[in-house]
Amino acid sequence: MKVKLICVGKLKERYLKDGISEYQKRLSRFCQFEMIELTDERTPDKANFADNQLIMSKEAQRIHKKIGERDFVIALAIEGKQFPSETFSELISGVTVKGYSTITFIIGGSLGLDSIIKKRADMLMSFGLLTLPHQLMRLVLTEQIYRAFMITKGSPYHK
């Protein structure tokens, strides 16, 4: 199984890179994990609605090029479904049973995701109503993907 994480923006903070690197290493026992960082668009200080839509549209074009035609796509969005780690683990296991070989997660930039990406997604997922920096969300999501594999394995990692 392959797990892709498509992210808008470059990760700069060393502690986040180190954390993600650790979980990538751990995930290598269960799947081929790939994190794809895409360039984000610069947002003007006084951007209006139309400016923001144009920025998200440009970012969506970059994202769309990285999504495989047969990928099962989960986009992170505040309006997405929320569920406990056990259910997330079942979801990941179930995707492979349905015949998908690649699960692609998408984390948008600071403005979020364009509607075209949300429509392409097989599922919208949310980690709650809290606003988190999208760079931090990469680490949280990577840990949860690892946790999902550990739950499936029956490991005491998830207590």
Swiss-Prot record:
EC number: 2.1.1.177
Localization per record: Cytoplasm
InterPro entries assigned: Alpha/beta_knot_MTases, RlmH-like, tRNA_m1G_MTases_N
Enzyme type, top EC level: transferase
Reactions it catalyzes: pseudouridine(1915) in 23S rRNA + S-adenosyl-L-methionine = N(3)-methylpseudouridine(1915) in 23S rRNA + S-adenosyl-L-homocysteine + H(+)
GO cellular component: cytoplasm
GO MF annotation: an example: rRNA (pseudouridine-N3-)-methyltransferase activity
List of residues binding S-adenosyl-L-methionine: L76, G108, F127, G128, L129, L130, T131, L132
Record keywords: Cytoplasm, Methyltransferase, rRNA processing, S-adenosyl-L-methionine, Transferase
Gene3D superfamilies cross-referenced by the UniProt entry: 3.40.1280.10
Family stated for the protein in its record: Belongs to the RNA methyltransferase RlmH family.
The protein's role, per its UniProt record: Specifically methylates the pseudouridine at position 1915 (m3Psi1915) in 23S rRNA.
Quaternary context: Homodimer.
Protein name per the record: Ribosomal RNA large subunit methyltransferase H
Organism of origin: Streptococcus pyogenes serotype M18 (strain MGAS8232)
Gene: rlmH
